[in-house]
Amino acid sequence: MVEPLLSGIVLGMITVSAFGLFVAAFLQYRRGNQFEI
């Protein structure tokens, strides 16, 4: 009974953390480009 809930939480955490890393990298990349110009 608990395993589906646990796997769902783990998948959600992985998705959110991956999305957060992508957004942070994108913002840092844009900020670097603005500094260069």
From Swiss-Prot:
Keywords: Chloroplast, Electron transport, Membrane, Photosynthesis, Plastid, Thylakoid, Transmembrane, Transmembrane helix, Transport. It is found in: Plastid, Chloroplast thylakoid membrane. SUPFAM superfamilies: PetG subunit of the cytochrome b6f complex. One of its GO terms (biological process) is photosynthesis. Pfam families: PetG. It is a single-pass membrane protein. InterPro entries: Cyt_6/f_cplx_su5, Cyt_6/f_cplx_su5_sf. GO terms for molecular function: electron transporter, transferring electrons within cytochrome b6/f complex of photosystem II activity. The chain crosses the membrane at residues 5-25. It comes from the Eukaryota. GO terms for cellular component: chloroplast thylakoid membrane; cytochrome b6f complex. Its main location: plastid. Component of the cytochrome b6-f complex, which mediates electron transfer between photosystem II (PSII) and photosystem I (PSI), cyclic electron flow around PSI, and state transitions. PetG is required for either the stability or assembly of the cytochrome b6-f complex. The 4 large subunits of the cytochrome b6-f complex are cytochrome b6, subunit IV (17 kDa polypeptide, PetD), cytochrome f and the Rieske protein, while the 4 small subunits are PetG, PetL, PetM and PetN. The complex functions as a dimer. Belongs to the PetG family. This is Cytochrome b6-f complex subunit 5. It comes from Thalassiosira pseudonana. The lineage of its organism: Eukaryota, Sar, Stramenopiles, Ochrophyta, Bacillariophyta. The gene is petG.
